[in-house]
Swiss-Prot record:
Interacts with PFN2. Interacts (via N-terminus) with KIF20B; this interaction is direct and promotes the association of SHTN1 to microtubules in primary neurons. Associates with microtubule. Interacts with L1CAM; this interaction occurs in axonal growth cones. Interacts with actin filament retrograde flow; this interaction is enhanced in a netrin-1- and PAK1-dependent manner and promotes F-actin-substrate coupling and concomitant formation of traction forces at axonal growth cones. Interacts with RUFY3. Residues 352-369 have a biased composition (Pro residues). The gene is Shtn1. Residues 403-418, 590-621 have a biased composition (Basic and acidic residues). Residues 343-508, 525-633 are annotated as: Disordered. This is Shootin-1. Keywords: Acetylation, Cell projection, Coiled coil, Cytoplasm, Cytoskeleton, Developmental protein, Phosphoprotein.
Length: 633
């Protein structure tokens, strides 16, 4: 099989080589023919150029002769004119001489005059005869005739030469046209020759490649022949060894009668050896076939991949051309629209001046960061909105009572501020400058606050936490609201009684409480504020509050000074920063947005100027803390 395939390949290669050689010979013959035609055209061109040069020489000779004749004619004309001028001068001189002679003869006698006159009569006749002889001499007439004949002949020659010149010029133009045609044909022939040379070079390359492939195939053939010979020799050696082994086995069998099992094993061994050799030969053939297939498949895959890449590139090119055309159209449309808009703008600027800009909107009210943080914590503890709806449904009545209590508490606070309660001074030097912070998520703010609370928990002693006991598990806000509710129910009949009881209950009594218990209570209130799932009952119809204005506010905590913790609410919009001090004995009271707006402006002014806030101490009997209003932060 291999030998037949190799012979077929060799036949194909030889046929291709013969075809390439035949094409090469045909192209060579065509090249020779084109060279012969080119040589003929060159010879014709050279002959035409020679004829042109001869015509040019003849025309130059004729022009020189004509110029010589014209010069000779001009010389003869000048000679004749000079002769005529001399004749006129002589006539004038003769006349003057006659006049002079007549004057002299008048002086002489009449006899002499008559004689003289006779002599003179004879003389003018002789003079006229001499003049006639001079004028009518044969030589002059001959010369004049010759000159006239020469002039006529020269003119005729001139006409003939002019005609010849015109004919030569026409011939020259025709020859030039022929030369141009020959040049064009030569250029065409040169281009054809170049093309044929390129084809010849391609054929040479193809023939070189074919020869190289033929040589490679010859080398492979020789190698395969050598390998086949080696394989045959190896097979012969193996066959000889196998025969030797068979003989030895027969001798052994004859010498010692073995068992039937040994005979069967030997037979099986021989069969297995034959099968192994056959399988080895088949395996080698399969390996060769697979290698050839792999080579062919690799080439086909490369060609297929290249074709696919070509198609993809062509598609990309078309898409890019379409995009380019569309972008050009868009650019034109945009230019047109820009021009129209510029025209409109120019017309509007020229026609009517622009109206004044509207006034800027009023700045929003300052946000309440503590309220926003509380709403954030509420959202974190209650992510779903179903629980808030249930709470709103279950507690619509208590919200109205709480709002009334809040209003009463605000009025009480305002009365105390107006009466002039002594306020604690606040250290304003430790106040940090307001810096614009970027908007952070609710989770990061809550994590920071919880970390601060953790540090506060670590700083305080464990005794203060144990001394509080299980009574502090309830939040301070719930206690205050419960107490206010009881007082409101007890004294609902008279508003003065409500005010008195609420004032007596909410008014702090100055007592001696240890600083440890104060700090512990303050910590517990802070933890209750930030960790309570629902510290404030929302107003009906309000829904969960959102965190607004976090970018313009910042909450900072200060370490305890003189037994209390201070918290600052710094706003980047306000230059004078309001300070809220959370003391261990201060009371926390809830407020709504409307109540915060109804506050007295004097309190806001005092807080902006940096004055201290009222300090409310815990009652010794109850041990409860209040809440300061922090809506102005």
């Amino acid at each position: 099989m291999n030998s037949s395939d190799e012979e077929k390949q060799l036949q194909l290669i030889t046929s291709l080589k013969e075809q390439a050689i035949g094409e090469y010979e045909d192209l060579r013959a065509e090249n020779q023919k084109t060279k012969e035609t080119c040589d003929k055209i060159r010879q014709e061109r050279d002959e035409a150029v020679k004829k042109l040069e001869e015509f040019q020489k003849i025309s130059h000779m004729v022009i020189e002769e004509v110029n010589f004749m014209q010069n000779h004619l001009e010389i003869e004309k000048t000679c004749r004119e000079s002769a005529e001028a001399l004749a006129t001068k002589l006539n004038k001189e003769n006349k003057t001489l006659k006049r002079i002679s007549m004057l002299y003869m008048a002086k002489l006698g009449p006899d002499v005059i008559t004689e003289e006159i006779n002599i003179d009569d004879d003389d003018p006749g002789t003079d006229t005869d001499a003049a006639a002889e001079t004028c009518v001499s044969v030589q002059c007439q001959k010369q004049i005739k010759e000159l006239r004949d020469q002039i006529v002949s020269v003119q005729e020659e001139k006409k003939v030469l002019a005609i010849e010149l015109e004919s030569l010029k026409s011939k020259l133009g025709e020859v030039m046209e022929e030369v141009n045609k020959v040049k064009q044909e030569k250029a065409v022939l040169n281009s054809e020759v170049l093309e044929q040379r390129k084809v010849l070079e391609k054929c040479n390359r193809v023939s070189v490649l074919a020869v190289e492939e033929y040589e490679e195939l010859q080398v492979n053939l020789e190698l395969e022949k050598d390998l086949r010979k080696k394989a045959e020799s190896f097979a012969q050696e193996m066959f000889i060894e196998q025969n030797k082994l068979k003989r030895q086995s027969h001798l052994l069998l004859q010498s010692s009668l073995p068992d039937q099992q040994l005979l069967k094993a030997l037979d099986e061994n021989a069969k297995l050896i034959q099968q192994l050799e056959e399988e080895r030969i088949q395996h080698q053939q399969k390996v060769k076939e697979l290698e050839e297939r792999l080579e062919n498949e690799a080439l086909h895959k490369e060609i297929h991949n290249l074709r696919q890449q070509l198609e993809l590139l062509e598609d990309d090119k078309r898409e890019l051309e379409q995009k380019y055309q569309s972008s050009e159209e868009k650019a034109r449309n945009l230019k047109h629209s820009v021009d129209e808009l510029q025209k409109r703008v120019n017309q509007s600027e020229n026609s009517v001046p622009p109206p004044p800009p509207p006034p800027p909107p009023l700045p929003p009210p300052p946000p309440n960061p503590i309220r926003s943080l509380m709403s954030m914590i509420r959202k974190r503890s209650h992510p779903s909105g179903g629980s808030t709806k249930k709470e709103k449904a279950t507690q619509p009545e208590t919200a109205e009572e709480v709002t009334d209590l809040k209003r009463q508490a605000v009025e009480e606070m305002m009365d105390r501020i107006k009466k002039g309660v002594h306020l604690r001074p606040v250290n304003q030097t430790a106040r940090p400058k307001a810096k614009p912070d970027s908007l952070k998520g609710s989770e990061s703010a809550v994590d920071e606050l919880k970390g601060i609370l953790g540090t506060l928990n670590k700083s305080t002693s464990s005794r203060s936490l144990k001394s509080l006991g299980p009574e502090n598990s309830e939040t301070e806000l719930e206690r205050i609201l419960r107490r206010r509710k009881l007082t409101a129910e007890a004294d609902s009949s008279s508003p003065t009684g409500i005010l008195a009881t609420s004032e007596s209950k909410s008014m702090p009594v100055l007592g001696s409480v240890s600083s440890v218990t104060k700090s512990a209570l303050n910590k517990k209130t802070l933890e209750a504020e930030f960790n309570n799932p629902c510290p404030l009952t929302p107003e009906p119809g309000e829904g969960p509050r959102k965190l607004e204005g976090c970018t313009n506010s910042k909450v900072t905590f200060q370490p305890p000074s003189k037994g209390g913790y201070r918290r600052k609410c710094v706003g980047s919009e306000n230059q004078s920063e309001p300070v809220v001090v959370l003391d261990p004995v201060s009371t926390h009271e809830p407020q709504t947005k409307d109540q915060a707006a109804e506050k007295d402006p004097t309190q806001c002014k005092e807080e902006e100027r940096g004055e201290t806030q009222p300090e409310f101490k815990e009652d010794s009997s109850g041990g409860k803390t209040g809440e300061t209003d922090s809506s102005n932060c």
